[in-house]
Amino acid sequence: MFGFLFKKIFGSKNDRYLRRLRSQVQSINALEPQMQELADEDFAARILQYKKAVQEDGQSLDALLPEVFALVREASRRVLGMRHYDMQLIGGMVLHKGKIAEMKTGEGKTLVATLPVVLNALSGKGVHVVTVNDYLAKRDAAWMGQLYGFLGLSTGVIVHGLDDDERKQQYESDITYGTNNEFGFDYLRDNMKFYGHQLVQRGHNYAIVDEVDSILIDEARTPLIISGASDESVGMYRIVDEVVCKLRPEHYTVDEKARTAMLTDEGVAYCEEMLKLDNLFDPANITAQHHVLQSLKAHQVFKRDVDYIVQDDQVVIVDEFTGRLMAGRRYSDGLHQALEAKEGVTIAAENQTLASITFQNYFRLYDKLSGMTGTADTEAVEFHQIYNLEVISIPPNRPMQRKDYPDLIYRSRQEKFDAIVEAITELHKNRQPVLVGTISIETSEMLSHRLSKLGVPHNVLNAKQHEKEAEIVAQAGQPGKVTIATNMAGRGTDIVLGEGVVDLGGLHILGTERHESRRIDNQLRGRSGRQGDPGSSRFYLSLEDDLMRLFGSDRIKGLMEKLGLRDGEAIENAMVTRAVEGAQKRVEAHHFEVRKTLLDYDNVMNQQREVIYALRRELMVEEDLDPVMDEFMNDVLDDVYSTLDGVPVDDHNGLREAAFARLRDVFNLDRVLPENAHLPEREECEPLIRKVLEELRSETGDSYRDIQRYFMLEELDRCWKEHLRNMDALRDGIGLRGYGQRDPKLEYKREGFEMFQAMLFQIRENVFRALSRVRVAPAETAPVEAIEIAPETEEAQGQPLAREYRHKEDRGQLSYSGGGNAEDARNTPAKAAPRIGRNDPCPCGSGRKYKKCCGADK
């Protein structure tokens, strides 16, 4: 009661925050006459002046906000013909403060972003504007780039297909547009490079995420993964698929809520008989068991034209939230191969994770993060808990006039779609445009087929027809237009009403099914009623819809039975609408827990990732790596000699002998020790190791530092890749610890830490084991063919190329032997040295590019 009165008198927290910002709006407006007097060439000069004040004089961005916002508003009026409204100024301030601005469709979010973008670009550290697809990134960069260019700021855009040099150039711009995937993958690829000059990103200063709910919430369950092909055979998938596709309903059970499928006892017996196995769950048959369960999931849980489509001999995932194709993305853990076997297309090799990060942890790298969307309030708690982002709702510039009608609920899907087709036909006759939202490609194509039979012209927009997406969406407001869109693809493109449509009631939104998330439904509704335009919306549901069937209340079904509704009749009741929203809240809570659990587990990996990437960055950019080598050496020596504490000289258990053997193996001490040598004391061992390294330094000359860097990075990458695989395996089975009354998350954290510590130690030992065995052989007697290490997947483009090391003046070439004698060398695979890139620094030490120096004649 008290809280209600407090809000009534003083307003909500949101209202009070907006009131504080309005005083700054007055300051900005007061500067408008002054800005209008400036000549065009004065704008860029002003920006340079502000840059100097921030970068050299230490002036805060907050102090410059009124002047910069006023300058940008006037520049926008001159260049784009658009002047920022007061509410757009407030939206810009909210973004600058590192919060999420919730602004309804048509309120000009793209223009709002220019205000904080210019202000934060003054620091010279770069600003990233994150969009949901390449089309919007290119469109906004070209459109708003006119304004930034007028102000003397450079604009870049990161899209698929750019090489590293082009990407680096775009990131050097003051403002860089791109998709969340491109930014995330560039970060991962940067942490797989070998040299500091190969890095494309220059830090994570400030990001504005457009459609922030789509990127930070909807896609948070899908980690970014760079993977390479593993050595697993794919033949088993076909064999298992032939068995699983013959299973009968009594052989398995399906949990649609959890999206899982399990074999019954009859199913297990059938699979054992068909695969000729004694016990499917025997540890020796763990691979076969995994294949069977993934194939069962592919057949019974995943649906064609809903979860994926088949295109060009490939299984392509469909984004469940946007309806767009996710080209290049693959399900992990063998599920994608099971789907390929199910559909009879070519089965690609299984992948092994080389690098991964979730969007949650990627975007938390930024010093300041903000976002814009039309629908964030329903997820405000999650934004606050996971990203520490506050959601501020910005009132529309003009009052909303859209009418949102109550849902209509039918008993069956057939009755529902009959009513939908009838409603579309009636609206088309009246020339009122209608946008029909579906949640699957299957539904959109079924509706399209029925409308075609009735002779109703229409456009279909789904993952199969996405090339003209923006054009189709932009035309959806013309008189008589019928547009069918899957999961509201086309966000970011305004639907402008055609001539006379306002008098017809504006754009009508017709939802064929409620989505699991209220926010997605609100996004669909938000396509109508922009900038105070009239509009309307209504959802059509049935008791057979997935949401109603899995999460809906039995009360609705009971009510419909009591009312004795006849075929084709619908129930329209506020209680029903509330019950549907209650079902959606339960689903949202479930998905929130899934995302939070994913983050809890990824936080363990994130801490480890930060340590590895920091070490990797140091190895890439530091000129002198000897201090790191000294640290590695002392860590190994401390560990070896700590095992001998209290062990007598006349050790009968062989501990001293084992320690000596380990030292000789790791540091290749046989290279400098006399025959019949015994374990040296701790202080005597260090000079021996330095002697081994000094011999290598004298043999390799100026190439020593490159060789040193190469082996350190190579061992770090190899061990990290293996560690990722081990952590995946640990994660897969950790849930079983719950049966032993142990917390799986704590167990994962503890064991993951132990595995990480062991990996770090393995890196230290392997670096010395490899480096101490390098030999320089005469070039004419031991030619080494230069090769390029090709990435296995498209996502892995930009992986480092290993180096070809030549002795100074080309007197010799590197070889790597695996031990101290010829027998060891014969049994160890040789490491071929890849070629030098033409734009890389010349290894002769001149400081010039290879193509301008020793490679000029090649």
Curated annotation (Swiss-Prot):
EC number: 7.4.2.8
Example GO BP: protein import
Coiled-coil region list: none
Assigned GO CC terms: cell envelope Sec protein transport complex; cytosol; plasma membrane
A GO molecular-function annotation: protein-exporting ATPase activity
Required co-factors: Zn(2+)
Topology in membrane: Peripheral membrane protein
Cofactor: how bound: May bind 1 zinc ion per subunit.
NCBIfam families, A to Z: PRK09200.1, PRK12904.1, secA
Free-text function comment from the UniProt entry: Part of the Sec protein translocase complex. Interacts with the SecYEG preprotein conducting channel. Has a central role in coupling the hydrolysis of ATP to the transfer of proteins into and across the cell membrane, serving as an ATP-driven molecular motor driving the stepwise translocation of polypeptide chains across the membrane.
Assembly and binders: Monomer and homodimer. Part of the essential Sec protein translocation apparatus which comprises SecA, SecYEG and auxiliary proteins SecDF-YajC and YidC.
Name by which UniProt lists this protein: Protein translocase subunit SecA
Originating organism: Desulfovibrio desulfuricans (strain ATCC 27774 / DSM 6949 / MB)
